[in-house]
Amino acid sequence: DRCIWPKEGFSIYWNIPTHFCHNFGVYFKEL
């Protein structure tokens, strides 16, 4: 899974709950 912050212009990969990502950025469920 990945979370992207458009304002900061970078993305990171998560292994944490998706709701946490939604609070801070845009969540993408990668297949």
Curated annotation (Swiss-Prot):
Can you say where in the cell this protein is located? Secreted
The domain of life for this entry's organism is Eukaryota
Which Enzyme Commission number(s) are on file for it?
3.2.1.35
Q: Which reaction does it catalyse?
A: Random hydrolysis of (1->4)-linkages between N-acetyl-beta-D-glucosamine and D-glucuronate residues in hyaluronate
Record keywords: Allergen, Disulfide bond, Glycoprotein, Glycosidase, Hydrolase, Secreted
One Gene Ontology term, aspect cellular component: extracellular region
EC top class, in one word? hydrolase
What is the similarity comment for this entry?
A: Belongs to the glycosyl hydrolase 56 family.
Q: What is this protein called?
A: Hyaluronidase
